[in-house]
Amino acid sequence: MLNISIAIDGPAGAGKSTIAKIIGNKLNIMYINTGSMYRAVTLMALKNNIEPSDIESLKTLINSMDISFNGNNIIVNGKDLEEAIRMPIINNNVSKYAAVEEVRELLVSMQQNISQKYNVVMDGRDIGTVVLKDAPYKFFITASAEVRAKRRLKELKEKKINISFQDVLKEIKERDYIDSNRKVNPLKQSKDAILIDTSNFTIEEVVDKICSIIKRD
């Protein structure tokens, strides 16, 4: 399998990361969770008291970050940040930092460099429309806000994070609004992407559907 790239986009909590991860394993290609990269920038910015409006400090911060992946975990400057970037404070702030044009430009450049070197499956908000515009396989994964909130709540409870369903639903809806209405690279379905609503399907069913489309070619 040479020069394959798979773009998976969709809103928060649609299941795209889980789906992309399994597809990466099944097809033996590199999985890049671009959302983890924005979360890592958010974590480091908050730790360093850098506001989303402080563009120069954000650019300096990102240029100082050596980002890689170990399996499914994101490594920044040699440290595994996977657990830290899943905390509610990151959920509540990531869309603000991800909306900054200069942040997106720097991370998109990193993502495109990776895709030129490896066969990849990437998930995010702007993969099919910006990062991998020429990807032969594009999918837009979605589900109702309520279904996505239930899934996210289950994930958080498994991590012993106590939060109400209403708070998770509110956060999902707020992120949807910010992601879809930001000026730079908003969340939207690429015209040539296949739409899959996962509300009434299991993860396995969605993975099988996507893999059958890829293998068909």
Swiss-Prot record:
Catalytic activity, reaction form: CMP + ATP = CDP + ADP; dCMP + ATP = dCDP + ADP
Gene3D superfamilies linked to this entry: P-loop containing nucleotide triphosphate hydrolases
SUPFAM superfamilies: P-loop containing nucleoside triphosphate hydrolases
InterPro entries (alphabetical): Cytidylate_kin, Cytidylate_kinase_dom, P-loop_NTPase
Keywords associated with the record: ATP-binding, Cytoplasm, Kinase, Nucleotide-binding, Transferase
Molecular function GO terms recorded: ATP binding; CMP kinase activity; dCMP kinase activity
NCBIfam families named in the record: cmk (TIGR00017)
Family that this chain belongs to: Belongs to the cytidylate kinase family. Type 1 subfamily.
Name of the protein this chain belongs to: Cytidylate kinase
Origin species: Clostridium botulinum (strain Loch Maree / Type A3)
